[in-house]
Amino acid sequence: HNKIGSVGKKFPDTNIKISDDGEILLQGRHIMKGYYNNKKATEEALVDGWFLTGDVGKIDDDGFLYITGRKKEIYVSSAGKNIAPLVIEETMKSIPIVSQCFLVGDNRNYCTALFTLDVGVILRDKIGIEATIIPKDPLKQLKVLGENGFSLKDYTESDEIFNEVQDEVNKLNLKFSNPEQLKKFSILPRDFTIDDGELTPTLKIRRKQITENWTEVIDSMYK
């Protein structure tokens, strides 16, 4: 049987363990013996016969493996606690009106987040436009919002929307340990974009650029 959120159990003749820093390590004759004619890469990938996957995860009592993030994306709090931002971000993105979530917490004493709002959801749930006629393109969505007499600012700066998001954050925080819970958040005036360097062409978030672009907002959550 399977478990939701798990990638399953190990195959026969495969060993899996979690390193002290949370990385998933694999061992088995079928994994790999090394890189062809590249001793340096082999030494970096294989340690004492264990293949370093670069993924961070956990194994439950039934032997099911869960991948919680990439090692290079792991945050370390000021108290030394490892935090996997991707898991928290994806959980918070389940809030209907939220489009993007960016977790802040690396070398900080608590976690905060930057949220952007989903204009399509605003058009559907707040203005009452039929979902089937809402355009997919974000710029066209903003145009429709304007045609209905509103701007995105009416929602990003709304106390009502902030409280709505806060209620959802309070519920979702219960899924995480105290160091992983969001203590504060800010709703940004616009969504992340490729043009501003905040998203890759495949729409993955660029952490360094987002941190640079929104430094003042981030710093305000730690005062």
In which residue ranges do the predicted regions lie?
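Conserved ATP-binding/catalytic segment of the ANL
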Residues: 10-77
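Short Gly/Ser/Thr- and Asp/Glu-enriched loop/turn motifs at secondary-structure junctions
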Residues: 70, 106-110, 180-182
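C-terminal boundary motif of the adenylate-forming
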Residues: 56, 95-121
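Adenylate-forming
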Residues: 45-46, 64-93, 122-157, 179-180, ...
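Conserved C-terminal "lid"/linker of ANL adenylate-forming enzymes
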Residues: 100, 166-223
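Membrane-embedded alpha-helical bundles of multi-pass transporters/translocases
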Residues: 58-62, 103-105, 136
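Active-site loops of AMP-binding adenylate-forming
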Residues: 1-5, 38-41, 119
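Gly/Ser/Thr-rich phosphate-binding loop
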Residues: 1-2, 15, 98-99
